[in-house]
Amino acid sequence: MPAVYGSRLTTFEDSEKESEYGYVRKVSGPVVVADGMAGAAMYELVRVGHDNLIGEIIRLEGDSATIQVYEETAGLMVNDPVLRTHKPLSVELGPGILGNIFDGIQRPLKTIAKRSGDVYIPRGVSVPALDKDALWDFQPKKIGEGDLLTGGDLYATVFENSLMQHHVALPPDAMGKITYIAPPGQYSLKDTVLELEFQGVKKQFTMLQTWPVRTPRPVATKLAADTPLLTGQRVLDALFPSVLGGTCAIPGAFGCGKTVISQALSKYSNSDAVVYVGCGERGNEMAEVLMDFPQLTMTLPDGREESVMKRTTLVANTSNMPVAAREASIYTGITIAEYFRDMGYNVSMMADSTSRWAEALREISGRLAEMPADSGYPAYLAARLASFYERAGKVKCLGGPERTGSVTIVGAVSPPGGDFSDPVTSATLSIVQVFWGLDKKLAQRKHFPSVNWLISYSKYSGALESFYEKFDPDFISIRTKAREVLQREDDLNEIVQLVGKDALAETDKITLETAKLLREDYLAQNAFTPYDKFCPFYKSVWMMRNIVHFNALANQAVEKAAGMDGQKITYSLIKHRLGDLFYRLVSQKFEDPAEGEEALVAKFKKLNEDLTAGFRALEDETR
């Protein structure tokens, strides 16, 4: 192994007994079968071959073990050594995670690029995930020697960056009486900052902890979620809301805008931290995230502008990286998310895309000669998906002080040809609570975000009712009315195609016009403009209120005039006489949230009053 990567492994190997080694018997792509592995455990981490490739045991039979290797296996030979490490695949958790970019098994890509000077990851490279020499500003809580600590207790804070305070917690499986706690100061991840004594045994702790990726981190209790995940996308916030701690799926064919929605969630959602996992997607998309995010800023409540990258961690496992590591990347991402949740933060995890993860499962399953199920996917696909999505939720964290945290999972799904009956999509939909279905036809019409409002749904609407009641008591009825208008438009479209628009009743013409307003000027949103890239919830509510108000007033005016002898009020008359109000309705989306909430709400209220006055004047004229 080149000296440049440190001699940590070499010394470890030299001290090992011969019994710690097995030998390669068979190589089939990323799957390696090794003999002489008696005593090994399932999911144990191993080092394969003379290059020390990282692998994980996925099947045991007699003294032979089947290993999935997370690196390119070209050049491995029969009888190459396989070294056992006696520990599962784990991630390092501590200060330094945020703003970093890792590969699927938590190797820091920036560090590897600097050390190797290569554009590709060298085989067998072993670099610590977090920088052990960097110094962090350690501030202990008001506790001292003799105090008792239990698993999950927060005993110090570390200044991670100007956006996030990093709380240092005791690992969930530790407890005892404090015999030493470091005074405030600068410490690295190697330095002992805490010593506990339990049943006469003393144990030292650093700010770093490791956790096996396949094991969910323990919590005190799971709670019912009741706070919305505000994404800044009108169609999602208003019609199909998710909650902090929810599970969402974004299935859609290629070119429908899954990645743009995932990135918008990362940039603008009301989460405290974001873990973005690029799992088997194009490398350019991760490069785009790396270029965009450091330049993007978010405005904090105290008016400070901070880079979005300071609250983001990227796990990049692009399509040209080894297939087996895709499976690990999802678990790496969710474990990092759970770590920040345990500090009391609301974390969002974007998995783009879970279909590529399922394809990795299918490939490994095929190499193991397991019985294929639907479309060649393994029979345990639904169980694996469920075990991943079940790690989401709002929880009461372990230890003190009492705090709640949440992990929201948003999984993009790429069904081949946009077919939602694909096994991955149907298995995902049986688990998740929110379905944002993207439509190829809408994308072809350049209607973005291309969320189909007729097939999408959210099962969290009931859980959020108390929030909406406090925010705006009218919102639920306004949303119901808007949905009815969109549904009615779909029914009328068939009639229009048969007999034309002119044959419709006046009220139906108004319904079609309102639906067009909702579709083109409310649900469609331009992610690349300063005024529309992010829509605050109050703006979404007021825009919808004014459009629904116009619909109600127009229908009322037509129905009132229908029974009178005077001039009839028709849809064309309304459009002709109230053209400027109509134009103002269309232009609501151009109001820039940067002007502030008060200024915008005043404008929307004025429009609402002008609509009422305009229709009243029209009714008086035609009497």
From Swiss-Prot:
Pfam annotation, one family: ATP-synt_ab_N
Reaction catalyzed: ATP + H2O + 4 H(+)(in) = ADP + phosphate + 5 H(+)(out)
Record Gene3D superfamilies: 2.40.30.20, 2.40.50.100, Bovine Mitochondrial F1-atpase, Atp Synthase Beta Chain, Chain D, domain 3 (1.10.1140.10), P-loop containing nucleotide triphosphate hydrolases (3.40.50.300)
Binding residue positions for ATP: G252, A253, F254, G255, C256, G257, K258, T259
InterPro entries: ATP-synt_VA_C (IPR055190), ATP-synth_a_Xtn (IPR031686), ATP_synth_asu-like_sf (IPR023366), ATPase_a/bsu_AS (IPR020003), ATPase_F1/V1/A1_a/bsu_N (IPR004100), ATPase_F1/V1/A1_a/bsu_N_sf (IPR036121), ATPase_F1/V1/A1_a/bsu_nucl-bd (IPR000194), ATPase_F1/V1_b/a_C (IPR024034)
Entries under CDD domains matching the protein: ATP-synt_V_A-type_alpha_C, ATP-synt_V_A-type_alpha_N, V_A-ATPase_A
PROSITE patterns: ATPASE_ALPHA_BETA
The UniProt record lists the keyword Ion transport: yes
GO molecular function, one term: ATP hydrolysis activity
Record flagged with keyword Nucleotide-binding: yes
Function: Catalytic subunit of the peripheral V1 complex of vacuolar ATPase. V-ATPase vacuolar ATPase is responsible for acidifying a variety of intracellular compartments in eukaryotic cells.
Protein family according to the UniProt entry: Belongs to the ATPase alpha/beta chains family.
Descriptive protein name: V-type proton ATPase catalytic subunit A
Native source organism of the sequence: Gossypium hirsutum (Upland cotton)
